[in-house]
Design a protein with these regions (language model features):
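Sec-dependent signal peptide recognition
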Residues: 2-8
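C-terminal motif of bacterial Sec signal peptides marking the signal peptidase cleavage site
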Residues: 13-16
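Flexible, low-complexity junctional segments that flank or bridge functional domains
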Residues: 18-251, 276, 447-475
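Flexible loop residues that form catalytic
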Residues: 157, 257, 331
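Active-site-proximal loop/turn and secondary-structure-junction residues that shape catalytic pockets
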Residues: 199, 258-260
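C-terminal "post-core" interaction segments
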Residues: 225, 230, 238-239, 244, ...
Length: 475
């Protein structure tokens, strides 16, 4: 077997994995990679082609090598190989730096540390405000005192408009001015402050809490990326849920509206922590992976078992055990590993989706780099499809999973996570106990709904919203 590729296969939805008890064993590297002798673009492209031919899920749909534009720059050549790029294959990508690619997949980014939505500031639909959805822990934004629900009104002294809102936060250091909001009017505070982007590790648990609601103990978890380095932190949250007031929580609301994926092993862990009656399921099928025909043959030859194709439930002491249902808050930002949790739970319990449709990514990847370090780029092509224990995987469309309860996240200002008056969480509580919700609603003043400019990722969100599912794959 030629030692030409370093393949990290992190079953992320994003899938990234660490060597823990839940790590999926990496499939072996195929031996069909052509060894190039030069560092020219053409040689790099031959390497890319052979790697894609060996591992790409749609390898059978690729053009012949001789018919490709072999002299293109590698970053351009890669995308010419994709099957139905941006329609069928909406997900494969390449970075000129494998280091940058790996850092992104592991939640290490240089950012302000905010996710935000753009809303029109007035009826002219010319001026724009950024409403902060969340602030990363340990970020420059948190240090500056920014929080969910704040409105960014000016940047570097300029009003945010439909002409500049997609690029106005690109500089490394920025002067930001917030706005107060009252009676449908935004008013600048007149107190700008400076903030500089920093490189930080995403801490994926934004909020976990338990509230008492109509005689029930309701657990709430907002989780924004599946990072295996935080698996023990996730277990700790569920241990708190399980032991709350001795008998544990009665209902779980899992907020994945901002979770674009991550490590498959971490997605599998979350599934195991939630699923009802885990002990009876240990050793049975949770999910399966489907590869291209050629790579399937390689894996079958490598192992006599289904270890590369089937993921079974594993024992987890923090499993909640008794829940008959789970409420999952979703949006178009709910993707890949997040959708994997939804799909894997559906055969075993009632999964109630609240919000908007999910992204629609039922496929994953592993990272391909040149182990001889002739080229520094990293490839992240789609290499497998996932199905659940019932062989279901029918959410791989632009509509993803449709919600059971459609809710728009456009009530401003955004309320804190875990607050009963917060739009998504409040809807879940209204289903848990409609009577209690109606009684409390009499005390809650209605808030206006804003008109969103679009739902495209902006600024930090472009970086933090990478939607992936991968498995770690090393030779």
């Amino acid at each position: 077997m030629k030692n030409l590729l370093y393949i990290s296969a992190l079953i992320l939805v994003l899938f990234a994995c660490k060597k823990t008890e839940v790590t999926t064993k990496a499939p072996p590297v195929s031996s069909n990679i052509t060894e190039a002798s030069t560092t020219s673009d053409s040689a790099a492209n031959v390497f890319i082609y052979d790697a894609m031919k060996g591992y790409y899920l749609w390898a059978d749909q690729m053009p012949s090598l001789s018919s490709t534009a072999i002299k293109l720059k590698p970053i351009n050549y890669f995308y010419t190989l994709l099957y139905g790029y941006d329609t069928i294959d909406r997900f494969s990508w390449m970075d000129t730096s494998a280091t940058n690619l790996t850092n992104q997949l592991n939640g290490i980014n240089t950012v302000l540390g905010i996710k935000y939505s753009a809303f029109f500031a007035d009826n002219t639909q010319t001026n724009v405000v950024f409403s902060i959805s969340y602030v990363l822990k340990g970020s420059a934004a948190e240090a500056a005192g920014l929080k969910r629900g704040d409105f960014i009104y000016k940047v570097d002294g300029k009003q945010i408009t439909v002409s500049n809102y997609q690029s106005i936060l690109q500089n490394q250091t920025l002067s930001i001015e917030l706005a107060n909001y009252a009676n449908g009017v935004y008013t600048a505070t007149g107190k700008p402050f400076s903030i500089t982007k920093t490189t930080l590790q995403t801490i994926p648990i934004l909020k976990d809490t338990v509230i008492e609601w109509a005689g029930k103990k309701v657990g709430y978890l907002n989780y924004i990326q599946f990072l295996n380095s935080f698996d023990d932190s996730l277990r700790a949250v569920f241990n708190r849920f399980k032991s709350y007031k001795n008998s544990g929580i009665d209902e779980l609301v899992l907020d994945l509206r901002y979770n674009g994926g991550g490590y498959v092993v971490s997605s599998d862990l979350l599934t195991s922590l939630i699923v009802k009656d885990l002990p009876s399921k240990v050793g049975t099928v949770m999910s399966k992976k489907v590869y291209n025909n050629a790579y399937t043959a390689v894996l079958r030859k490598e192992a006599n078992s289904d270890q590369y194709f089937i993921t079974n439930f594993k024992s987890e002491s923090a499993n909640l055990g008794k829940l008959n249902r789970v409420f999952i808050l979703t949006s178009p930002g709910t993707a890949s590993a997040s959708e994997l949790v939804i799909n894997n739970l559906k055969p075993f319990m009632d999964v109630i989706l609240i919000g908007e449709h999910t992204f629609g990514k039922n496929v994953g990847s592993f990272t391909i780099t040149d182990s001889k370090k002739r080229w520094s780029f990293g490839l992240q092509p789609i290499t497998f499809k996932t199905v659940n224990a019932r062989d279901e995987s029918n959410y791989g469309t632009v509509n993803g999973f449709l919600p059971d309860y459609l809710v728009k996240d456009n009530v401003i200002p955004f309320k804190p996570f875990g607050d009963p008056t917060e739009t998504y969480f409040g809807k879940a509580l209204s289903i848990i106990s409609p009577v209690a919700y109606k009684a409390n609603a009499l005390e809650w003043r209605p808030t206006p709904r804003a008109t969103q400019v679009n739902n495209l990722p902006l600024g930090d969100s472009r970086i933090m919203d990478r939607k992936e599912m991968w498995i770690e794959h090393k030779n």
